[in-house]
Amino acid sequence: MSISSDEVNFLVYRYLQESGFSHSAFTFGIESHISQSNINGALVPPAALISIIQKGLQYVEAEVSINEDGTLFDGRPIESLSLIDAVMPDVVQTRQQAYRDKLAQQHAAAAAAAAAATNQQGSAKNGENTANGEENGAHTIANNHTDMMEVDGDVEIPSNKAVVLRGHESEVFICAWNPVSDLLASGSGDSTARIWNLSENSTSGPTQLVLRHCIREGGQDVPSNKDVTSLDWNSEGTLLATGSYDGFARIWTKDGNLASTLGQHKGPIFALKWNKKGNFILSAGVDKTTIIWDAHTGEAKQQFPFHSAPALDVDWQSNNTFASCSTDMCIHVCKLGQDRPIKTFQGHTNEVNAIKWDPTGNLLASCSDDMTLKIWSMKQDNCVHDLQAHNKEIYTIKWSPTGPGTNNPNANLMLASASFDSTVRLWDVDRGICIHTLTKHQEPVYSVAFSPDGRYLASGSFDKCVHIWNTQTGALVHSYRGTGGIFEVCWNAAGDKVGASASDGSVCVLDLRK
């Protein structure tokens, strides 16, 4: 590669001319002796300087975002840089560290945060917050007041009611109970998923099956060394699907055997769900696409390339219709066989972290880094409710298994939201109001889960605590402090055990029976 000063000067001269700086161009041309150069200006295309600068900028962006082997750095998409950012010293190292910090926040894997939370105890008491919205159209709910609630008695779960499962060698990001038996699946940064057998029929205590996520290299299976980011059981409890940062989804039997490997994503998989019928699996990836897979053949039925940035979450509305959300701030509702979204919801002003259909499939809830929770209906383009009460990013949401179309039809439907502001909020969506604000946590809350009867809500935070709340009163009824920040909480089908996965590699099972 060679660059002469005459060539640089000519491109600058042409840029000044094309930009209307005629006097500056004349002066610069005289001082740099442009007329004496042997460059044929007729062969140089317009905007040549801008074009070559853009290519250089793209090269710096690639340096920041792509490893030497061509893979995305930390599985992140190429970030757009400004020209000034690109010429700053150490831009590659600075931006890569920023990526690591962002990833640490999203996955709550920052050891520093865990250490900071070690000696913190919840001193704030539980509160109740209600706010009134407008009667017609979209409801905008603001935080009006908080009344602190008393905690009833000693709520600490004794150690003999908590089983700590160890085996993972890195953070355990996710866990999920088998819907028909006491098998708990967990997924970790150690590139494994595990199936823990917690049935009381086992004479030797809990046992584990290790599901090693491998890729083919040189004709051999080698560990992928990538995080297991998502997992989901089918409704019959016979198969477990996992998604990984290596870009592959996998289907396993409950005995731990690999049944299928699903490979069409071009980057990490962030979310993965079975449909109720159990014939399709839906996945969302950093490659901006979502894919419906045939669970029987392992083949992709349809890929949906509608997002303009990484897809973060998906949820089925029916057996062939689903919603997806993205860092592009959009929500698409898509149907198998349709080549365009059947509905697009826009209104969030930052990344949309999670979406969930209510039990009837009529209302879709979404939460975002813009600190809002929105409720959408297929019957209209604008949101039905715009719920504003959290003062930091909302990480996840869950609907209660109550109301019409559920096994608990006489109980009111509720929505829970978990935020980086360390609070959990319970919402009455029909009225568009916050009915309880749960304020015991001291660090970001990453997971919430309703018990099967909807009477209790479990929450897990990076303060290492799992709290169990009464959904009717908002009272804290059980509390457990683990040894690592909590990423995920989940209830078993019987509603008497809560599983929790943690940043220190542990998986906890809390027995809530008397």
From Swiss-Prot:
Which is one Gene Ontology cellular component term of this protein? Answer: mitotic spindle
Localization of this protein: Nucleus
SUPFAM superfamilies tied to this protein: WD40 repeat-like
Which residue numbers delimit the LisH domain?
A: 4-36
Which of the residues bear the PTM N6-acetyllysine?
A: K102
Provide an example Pfam family for this protein.
Answer: WD40
Q: Consequence of mutating E171A?
A: Significantly decreases interaction with MECP2
PROSITE patterns assigned: LISH, WD_REPEATS_1, WD_REPEATS_2, WD_REPEATS_REGION
Please describe the quaternary structure of this protein.
Component of the N-Cor repressor complex, at least composed of NCOR1, NCOR2, HDAC3, TBL1X, TBL1XR1, CORO2A and GPS2. Probable component of some E3 ubiquitin ligase complex. Interacts with histones H2B and H4. Interacts with MECP2; bridges interaction between MECP2 and NCOR1. Interacts with USP44.
Q: What is the designated name of this protein?
A: F-box-like/WD repeat-containing protein TBL1XR1
Q: Which organism is it from?
A: Mus musculus (Mouse)
**Gene that codes for this?**
Tbl1xr1
